Every structure is written in structure tokens, then in C-alpha cells.
Swiss-Prot record:
HAMAP family to which the protein is assigned, alphabetical: CdhD
Pfam entry (one): CdhD
Higher taxonomy: Archaea, Methanobacteriati, Methanobacteriota, Stenosarchaea group, Methanomicrobia
InterPro entries referenced in this protein's UniProt entry, alphabetically: Ac-CoA_synth_d_su_TIM-brl (IPR016041), ACDS_complex_subunit (IPR051069), CO_DH/Ac-CoA_synth_dsu (IPR004486), Dihydropteroate_synth-like_sf (IPR011005)
Its job: Part of a complex that catalyzes the reversible cleavage of acetyl-CoA, allowing growth on acetate as sole source of carbon and energy. Probably maintains the overall quaternary structure of the ACDS complex.
Protein name (record): Acetyl-CoA decarbonylase/synthase complex subunit delta 1
Organism of origin: Methanosarcina acetivorans (strain ATCC 35395 / DSM 2834 / JCM 12185 / C2A)
Length: 436
């Protein structure tokens, strides 16, 4: 294979020799011009590059000819012509765009409407029926109105329990009578619903028989005419029996049985709901995939109709817990709107769980170097309000709450956003100088 050399190599080879002229010397070879980097097609850019390379080649030959005694005059290669840059067009108008929440293409699925409570027209004795769901977008957008407002159910227990002082002072005189407790919640604190928790049935507390616990449900049904939710003690072995007996004595009232979960006999609870005309609360623990699984089993295995399922994805208190709860609920609602038919159900929040955070009820921080927490009489209700309002924005429909002030504030805010309450218009353009 012939050795390749550059013209500059030949020039450099004779540069160190005292040679004035060469006679009778012939240099033979092929000349290659490297145009690497240029694409195919002979265009003006290629022509300019080729001309420039040819000029450089001519310079090398001129220098070599001079060394051999044949000086050749040659000028420097001219710079390639540069086309003038085109001026960018001036922007006159922005690209037209419209944000229409009511017609977002990805949100093509409506949330299932689920009624709670049967009036006399429905075969029950409730004075009203609560309707949840029906949304076609995330909540509180004025251009995508919610068909049904948020509802609040206030907790009642079948025995006296330990409560935060700020809560207990509102119920102390009625805590020994579930019927009176429920009545006070409705008449004084404007509860939309009542949730009766049969916690005394827990074998580790009083182990109240299911038959006796059912009498408490009857007492509450006679005391108030709003729809009710019926909760067990949380014991996975006892709850199916307790809820089945409670469903029997409240037949035809369309109560919400709370709750079916993957760690107990959900099929027994679903069977009782179908047999005695009730709804089922599908409860999971901050896991969207588990929520899908339980909903699927209730529908496919237990044949629960879609209009009898309400989800409770779990509510954790302020802090990281609320972050998880909010994110989980928002993901569930967005997935439902985008067509996941295993998640297109209304959601319920155990907002009362806010009182499980020590910051909501402790007098002060246990850390000496910590800042002042402020009076717990205000701090606790605010804790519950913020928990509920955060989850309302995520798409929650039903709130289980305790403190009457928290109930009043949450209802006022959500009903204002819903459009039920008219408020004074505020000039937001003057936000710097506005008085608060």
C-alpha cells in the first residue's frame, strides 16, 4: 500500500536542507482533498468549502515550487462569502390558547353518583338524601361546576371515650347517650349526616355483642332523620358480624357500612349491604393499587353495583401524612377522570384523624427550644379545618369530622367555592394595599 503524505510533509522535509534548486526530480502521486463533514449534494456551502481547500493546496504547491527554484506568486485565499443573516420576524401576537376545564379532552369520564339515605319516597325514613359524586373535573372550577356539594358527617360513639379537651367540652353532657349525641350534632352543629362508631364491640374493649350494638344503631336512627354511616371497632374478626347485624336492623335506610377492607371478610359486608339496601365504604391505606383491587373485588366478586361504592383512601394528619393523603386522593381522582373505571367513585375522608396529631391537642411542645404553639383551643380546630380543606381541593366528597367549629368553617368555605354562599367581591388587583 502506497504511503500517504501531506504536501506540508514534503515542504518540511526540505526545510532543514541547504538546497537551492532540484533538477531532474519528478514527484508522482495522487492528490486527495478531504471534505469531511459535508453532506451530499453540490450546494453553495460545498462550493465555498471546495474553493477554500483548493486555495490552501495552491499555497503548498507555490511553496514547494519556490524550494525547487521556480518561484510562483500567489495571493492569500479570499474568505468565503457569508450570506447575510435573515432578520427574525417581529412577534405581533401570542399564539391563541384557551384553558377550558369543562372540556379537557383527557377528562372524559364522570365520577359515579352515589346516594346515601332513603326517604319515604325511596322506602326509608330519612328526612333527606345525600348525593355524592358526579364530578367531571377537579373541584371548584367555575367553568366546570360540581353537581353535588361536599357533605359533612359528625362522629358519634357508642360509649364514652377519651377526647381532646377542645372537642370533649362540646359533647361532655351527651357522651353517655348516642341518640342525644347524634341529635345535638344535627340540631346544634348542622351535621349533614351522622357516623355511629360501634367501638365497644372490640373484644379488647367491652366486647359488646353484635345484637346489643345493633340496638345503638336503632337508637340513632330514631333520634335523627339524616342519613347515617355505621362504623365498627376496627377489629377484622368482629366487624363483619357487627356490621351485618347493624345492616339488618337498619334495612331500607341506605346507610353507609364502614367499612370493607382487604384485611377482613369484605364479602360478608358486601352481602349484608346488598341484602338490606345499603352502601359500602371501600377502605384502603394510602395505596391506589390496593384501592383498585378492593373496588374490583367488590364489583366483580361480590356484585356490588357501582352506585353503592364510596372510597376511603385514608386520611393522615398534617405533616408528611397529609402530603401522602392529598397526593393519593388527587392521583385517584385524576386517574378516574382519565378513564380508570376502577376508581370512578366518590371519596370519603376521616378528617377526625387530624386530632391524632399531638400538635393539635398538646398544651405546648415537649421541646424547650421549640417555638410557642399557641392556644390549643384554636390550634386543634384549625388543624382539622386545614386537613379537610386540603383534601377537598384534592377531590374529596364526604368529611367525617368532630369539632363543631371545624365543621362550620369547612362547610362555609366549601359551600362558598361551590357557589351556595354569596360573598363580597374582592379587588385582587390591589392585593398589595388590601386590608385583611
Amino acid at each position: 500500500m502506497a504511503k500517504k503524505m501531506k504536501l506540508s510533509d514534503i515542504t518540511n522535509m526540505f526545510a532543514g536542507m541547504d538546497v537551492e534548486a532540484l533538477e531532474g526530480v519528478t514527484i508522482e502521486g495522487d492528490i486527495e482533498i478531504d471534505l469531511g463533514g459535508l453532506g451530499g449534494g453540490f450546494d453553495p456551502m460545498l462550493a465555498a468549502a471546495l474553493g477554500q481547500e483548493s486555495a490552501v493546496l495552491a499555497q503548498h504547491f507555490a511553496r514547494l515550487a519556490g524550494m525547487f527554484g521556480y518561484p510562483v506568486g500567489i495571493g492569500a485565499p479570499a474568505a468565503p462569502a457569508v450570506s447575510p443573516a435573515l432578520a427574525a420576524p417581529k412577534l405581533k401576537d401570542l399564539i391563541p390558547a384557551k384553558f377550558d376545564v369543562a372540556n379537557i379532552a383527557e377528562w372524559a369520564t364522570e365520577i359515579q353518583e352515589v346516594p346515601i339515605g332513603n326517604t319515604s319516597a325511596d322506602g326509608g325514613s330519612r328526612g333527606k338524601r345525600v348525593m355524592l359524586g358526579g364530578e367531571k373535573a377537579l373541584p371548584f372550577y367555575f367553568d366546570a361546576p360540581m353537581p353535588n356539594r361536599n357533605q359533612v358527617t359528625i362522629d358519634v360513639f357508642d360509649m364514652r371515650i377519651g377526647l381532646a379537651k377542645a372537642v370533649k367540652e362540646n359533647y361532655d353532657e351527651v357522651m353517655d347517650s348516642p341518640g342525644e349525641w347524634a341529635k345535638k350534632n344535627v340540631e346544634k352543629f348542622n351535621a349533614d349526616m351522622i357516623t355511629i362508631h360501634l367501638i365497644s364491640t372490640d373484644p379488647l374493649i367491652k366486647d359488646t355483642p353484635a345484637k346489643e350494638a345493633a340496638k345503638t344503631v336503632e337508637e340513632v336512627l330514631q333520634a335523627v332523620d339524616v342519613p347515617i354511616a355505621i362504623g365498627g371497632s376496627g377489629n377484622p374478626q368482629k366487624d363483619p358480624e357487627v356490621l351485618a347485624r347493624a345492616a339488618e336492623v337498619s334495612e331500607g335506610e341506605r346507610c353507609l357500612l364502614a367499612s370493607a377492607s382487604l384485611n377482613l371478610d369484605y364479602a360478608a359486608i358486601a352481602e349484608a349491604a346488598l341484602k338490606y339496601d345499603h352502601d359500602v365504604l371501600s377502605w384502603t391505606q394510602l395505596d391506589m393499587n390496593a384501592q383498585k383491587e378492593l373496588n374490583r373485588k367488590l364489583m366483580k366478586q361480590c356484585n356490588v353495583p357501582r352506585d353503592r361504592i364510596i372510597m376511603d383512601p385514608t386520611t393522615a394528619a398534617l405533616g408528611y401524612g397529609l402530603d401522602y393523603a392529598y397526593t393519593n386522593m388527587e392521583r385517584i381522582r385524576l386517574a378516574a377522570l382519565m378513564g380508570d373505571d376502577e376508581l370512578t367513585f366518590p371519596m370519603s375522608s376521616g378528617t377526625t384523624n387530624a386530632w391524632g396529631a399531638r400538635e393539635s391537642w398538646m398544651v405546648s411542645s415537649p421541646l424547650k427550644e421549640d417555638s410557642d404553639w399557641g392556644p390549643r383551643e384554636y390550634r386543634g380546630p384549625i388543624w382539622e379545618i386545614v386537613t379537610g380543606l386540603s383534601l377537598a381541593i384534592a377531590g374529596n366528597d364526604l368529611f367525617m369530622m368532630m369539632h363543631p367549629t371545624s365543621v362550620a368553617v369547612l362547610k362555609q368555605i366549601t359551600q362558598t367555592l361551590f357557589g351556595m354562599i354569596d360573598t363580597e367581591q374582592v379587588d385582587v388587583a390591589n392585593w398589595i394595599g388590601a386590608e385583611v
